[in-house]
Amino acid sequence: MSGHSKWATTKNHKFAQDAKRSKMFQKFSKEIIVAATLGGADPDSNPALKLAIAKAKAKSMPKANIEKAIAKVAGGSKDGANYVSYLYSGTAMGGVTFLISCLSDNFNRLSSNIKHYFTKHNGQLGKQGAIPYVFDQKGIIEIAKSDAAEDELMMVALEAGASDFFSEDDSFIIYSEPTNFQVLKQTLDDNFKIENYLTAEVTYIANTEVDVDKAKLEQIEAFVSLLEDDDDIQEVYHNAYCEDN
């Protein structure tokens, strides 16, 4: 359980687009509304909602926004019932693989837009719904070093089923299998007074990376920004890596 976590660099690429905070919060709200609609507005009995809330909190979404999204469903709104999750993958930018997570109430619109984005950038779409072999789905929890002592945190995390543990410059990063994420996070909640997790979500991590230069990375980030501007697209992942970035 040593070395450098890929998440430490991946998150910098992935969240380079997060300056558009309003758009980001809108997408978190949609995810919360859909989860609450499908499984109920009580996060204690709805794991999907609990996960969506944890993810939003970790990205500093205001508590009032989260409560408003939940209250909308509790008040009888059925907006979330029309949304369906979709997963797209494809290659572009000279062999870089992209994985795109979507929540849409209009499959035809979404499908047409995705095809347009990849065609415009000389890309090729993979099979809809398939996860490329270059990505692994993992639970990720990142905690500021000021919030916990390393030895105690590592011991508690491993006993709760963590699959890996890394100490970075300013934070601890804990990996888990997706099926064990909720148990792990609840255990940390019970044992530590962590006000704000830096990251708390089930996400995709590249296990095989494509090395690119800064110029190519800028093109990739522009493509990611284009994708994330689409209201139907929730998350965009890629396996490009720039050593000089």
Curated annotation (Swiss-Prot):
GO molecular function, one term: DNA binding
Gene3D superfamilies: 1.10.10.200, 3.30.70.980
Keyword field contains Transmembrane helix: no
Residue ranges of the TM segments: none
Alphabetically ordered keywords of this record: Cytoplasm, DNA-binding, Transcription, Transcription regulation
InterPro entries in the cross-refs: Integrase-like_N, TACO1_YebC-like_2nd/3rd_dom, TACO1_YebC_N, Transcrip_reg_TACO1-like, Transcrip_reg_TACO1-like_dom3, YebC-like
Localization: Cytoplasm
GO CC entries: cytosol
Keyword field contains Cell division: no
Example of a GO biological process term: regulation of DNA-templated transcription
Highest rank taxon of the organism: Bacteria
Family note: Belongs to the TACO1 family.
Listed name of the protein: Probable transcriptional regulatory protein MARTH_orf271
Native source organism of the sequence: Metamycoplasma arthritidis (strain 158L3-1)
